[in-house]
């Protein structure tokens, strides 16, 4: 299934990768140059990043599994004690296989992969897909985490989980974290995320994810929601795990009912 066409400014600041090469890569994913877009996909010597040109004070968005927040979370975070780890059912030696069907910037998936789960990523937005692909390729080369990520974190070349076959592409857990319309205060908490939200917007068709997720999950579907959000599809989960600002709604799979 082809991605819907996305128009965005394409810029190369790299001495190694030309604008023509970036344009050709983007064309494969139906991303075209639009000089009027306030958003730009920029190739630097270090990475691929997304910028909001009309708000230059906002941070660029890019995927970095090696340093920054993710390195801190890997080294000093809760590991198996993290809420997402508990939600997917990590317990003792049990390390479920996971499909993250709304991968985004890959942060929760990275936590699960670093613990030892085998995680497959699906990302529907083509620009985010390229950011994620770029971040993974860089992480795969890292001496410290490259090997474990090559084993445990893989981006699938599909853009919706309804393209996966429940008979062959199943997993123990399907994880969903659809973008939700933010309350104004929470939208301003992480200013760098405003760039991401401007690109992606809310997942208005998020309800369409639950049925294919239930078909793919052998054990459970985990849906991450803001604490004020309604249930996905209006469907009551079997149970929920609550954190300070979010909750994880958990739907047990057919084999667990």
Swiss-Prot record:
<dbReference type="Pfam" id="PF04445">
    <property type="entry name" value="SAM_MT"/>
</dbReference>
<keyword id="KW-0698">rRNA processing</keyword>
<keyword id="KW-0808">Transferase</keyword>
<feature type="binding site">
    <location>
        <begin position="123"/>
        <end position="124"/>
    </location>
    <ligand>
        <name>S-adenosyl-L-methionine</name>
    </ligand>
</feature>
<comment type="function">
    <text>Specifically methylates the guanosine in position 1516 of 16S rRNA.</text>
</comment>
<keyword id="KW-0963">Cytoplasm</keyword>
<feature type="binding site">
    <location>
        <begin position="107"/>
        <end position="108"/>
    </location>
    <ligand>
        <name>S-adenosyl-L-methionine</name>
    </ligand>
</feature>
<dbReference type="GO" id="GO:0005737">
    <property type="term" value="C:cytoplasm"/>
</dbReference>
<comment type="similarity">
    <text>Belongs to the methyltransferase superfamily. RsmJ family.</text>
</comment>
<dbReference type="InterPro" id="IPR007536">
    <property type="entry name" value="16SrRNA_methylTrfase_J"/>
</dbReference>
<keyword id="KW-0489">Methyltransferase</keyword>
<dbReference type="GO" id="GO:0008990">
    <property type="term" value="F:rRNA (guanine-N2-)-methyltransferase activity"/>
</dbReference>
<feature type="binding site">
    <location>
        <position position="177"/>
    </location>
    <ligand>
        <name>S-adenosyl-L-methionine</name>
    </ligand>
</feature>
<protein>
    <recommendedName>
        <fullName>Ribosomal RNA small subunit methyltransferase J</fullName>
        <ecNumber>2.1.1.242</ecNumber>
    </recommendedName>
</protein>
<dbReference type="InterPro" id="IPR029063">
    <property type="entry name" value="SAM-dependent_MTases_sf"/>
</dbReference>
<keyword id="KW-0949">S-adenosyl-L-methionine</keyword>
């Amino acid at each position: 299934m082809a991605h819907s066409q996305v128009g965005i400014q394409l810029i190369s600041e790299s001495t190694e990768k030309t604008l023509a090469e970036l344009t050709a890569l983007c064309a494969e994913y139906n991303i075209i140059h639009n000089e009027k877009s306030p958003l730009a996909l920029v190739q630097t010597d270090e990475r691929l990043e997304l910028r909001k040109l009309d708000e230059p004070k906002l941070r660029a968005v890019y995927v970095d599994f090696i340093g920054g927040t993710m390195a801190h979370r890997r080294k000093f975070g809760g590991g198996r004690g993290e809420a997402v780890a508990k939600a997917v059912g990590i317990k003792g030696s049990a390390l479920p296989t996971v499909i993250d069907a709304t991968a985004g910037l890959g942060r929760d998936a990275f936590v699960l992969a670093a613990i030892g789960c085998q995680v497959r990523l699906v990302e529907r937005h083509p620009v985010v897909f390229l950011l994620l692909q770029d971040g993974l390729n860089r992480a795969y080369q890292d001496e410290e985490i490259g090997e474990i990520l090559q084993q445990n974190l893989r981006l699938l070349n599909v853009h919706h989980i309804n393209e996966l076959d429940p008979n062959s592409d199943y997993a123990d857990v399907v994880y969903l974290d659809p973008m939700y319309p933010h309350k104004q205060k929470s939208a301003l908490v992480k200013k760098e995320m405003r760039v991401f939200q401007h690109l992606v917007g809310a997942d208005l068709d998020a309800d369409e994810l639950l049925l294919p997720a239930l078909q793919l999950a052998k054990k459970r579907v985990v849906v991450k929601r803001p604490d004020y959000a309604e249930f996905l599809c209006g469907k009551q989960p079997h149970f929920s795990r609550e954190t300070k600002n979010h909750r994880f709604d958990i739907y047990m799979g057919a084999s667990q009912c």
